[in-house]
Regions:
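Extended substrate/RNA-proximal surfaces in nucleic-acid metabolism proteins
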Residues: 2, 29, 42, 47-158, ...
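Histidine-centered catalytic micro-motifs
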Residues: 4-14, 38-41, 130-134, 194
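Metal-associated gating/positioning segment near the N- to mid-region
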Residues: 12-48
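Histidine/acidic-residue-rich catalytic or RNA/ligand-binding cores of hydrolases
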Residues: 15-18, 47-51, 139-146, 166-180, ...
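Short hydrophobic alpha-helical runs that function as membrane-insertion/retention elements
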Residues: 36-38, 157-158, 190-192
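Conserved short secondary-structure transition element at the edge of the structured enzyme core
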Residues: 176-191
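Short acidic/histidine-rich active-site segments
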Residues: 188-202
Length: 236
C-alpha cells in the first residue's frame, strides 16, 4: 500500500521526543512522503511547549525538502465532558488539530462518561483526528465513537506506537481490531498514525499491517494513501 502522508508526529518541542523539525522533514522526504504533520503535545503533558509556541508557527515554512508541512497540536482531552487543554484562540492558529486522552492529565470517569466525552470531542468542529482511541488508556465504547466520527468527518487514528511491545498496552491490539471492524462495517475512514517521537519512526506502520489484514480492512478507507482525499475529507 502506497503511503503519502503521516500527520501524527512530535519533535523535541514536545519535551520527550528526540528529533528537530528539520530532521523530521528530511526523514519524511527520504521516505517519499508528500505531507508531514508535526503535532506537538499541548500544555497538559509535562515538559511540552508553552502555548506561545503555537502562536509563532507562522515563522516556519510550510514546505521543506519538497514535503508539505501541516503544523498543529495533539490536544489533551481532560474529562468526560470533552474539555480540552488548548484555547480556541490557539487552535485557530493550527493547520491540523488532533485530540487524545493521556493518563497524565485525564480525569477518569465511568466507561459511559469517558465515551460521552470522546463523542463530544469528535463532534467538536475544531478537531480533525482522535489520537490512539484504542490504546486502552481509558475504557470506551467504540461503536458510538465510530458513528460520531462518520457523522462529523472526524478521523479515528489506528496508532502504531500503541502496539509496540515496549509500550505495555495489553488491550491495544484487541481494541484496534474492534475499531477497524466497526469502521469497516459502517464504512468509516481511518488514519494510520506513526506517533513518531524520533525521525526514524516517521511513516512506520509495521505493527498495523497485520490488523488491517486480519480485518480485511478496505484500502480505500485508509486516508494515508492519498493527500487529495485526506484534505477533502477533513476540509483542509
Amino acid at each position: 500500500m502506497k503511503i503519502e502522508l503521516d500527520v501524527h508526529t512530535h519533535t523535541i518541542a514536545s519535551g520527550h521526543a528526540f528529533s528537530t523539525l528539520q530532521e523530521m522533514a528530511q526523514a519524511a522526504a527520504d521516505k517519499g512522503l508528500k505531507v508531514l504533520g508535526i503535532t506537538e503535545h499541548s500544555p497538559g503533558v509535562p515538559g511540552t511547549c508553552h502555548p506561545i509556541y503555537f502562536r509563532n508557527l507562522h515563522v516556519i515554512p510550510r514546505r521543506m525538502y519538497g514535503v508539505e508541512l501541516l503544523l498543529g497540536a495533539e490536544i489533551n482531552i481532560l474529562d468526560g465532558k470533552g474539555n480540552l487543554d488548548l484555547d480556541e484562540d490557539y487552535m485557530k492558529m493550527l493547520d491540523i488539530r488532533i485530540a487524545g486522552i493521556h493518563s497524565l492529565c485525564y480525569e477518569y470517569g465511568t466507561i459511559e462518561e469517558n465515551t460521552h466525552g470522546m463523542v463530544q470531542v469528535i463532534s467538536n468542529p475544531f478537531i480533525h483526528i482522535i489520537s490512539h482511541p484504542g490504546d486502552g488508556t481509558a475504557a470506551l465504547h467504540f461503536e458510538p465513537m465510530v458513528l460520531a466520527a462518520k457523522e462529523h468527518h472526524t478521523l479515528l487514528e489506528i496508532n502504531n506506537s500503541s502496539l509496540k511491545p515496549t509500550r505495555n498496552k495489553p488491550n491495544a491490539r484487541e481494541n484496534n481490531l474492534t475499531i477497524l471492524r466497526l469502521c469497516k462495517k459502517y464504512e468509516v475512514p481511518v488514519i494510520l498514525g506513526s506517533d513518531a517521537h524520533i525521525s526514524f519512526d516517521i511513516a512506520r506502520y509495521d505493527n498495523l499491517y497485520e490488523l488491517l489484514q486480519l480485518t480485511g480492512f478496505p484500502e480505500e478507507l485508509i486516508m494515508n494513501r492519498d493527500v487529495k482525499s485526506f484534505k477533502e475529507y477533513l476540509h483542509l
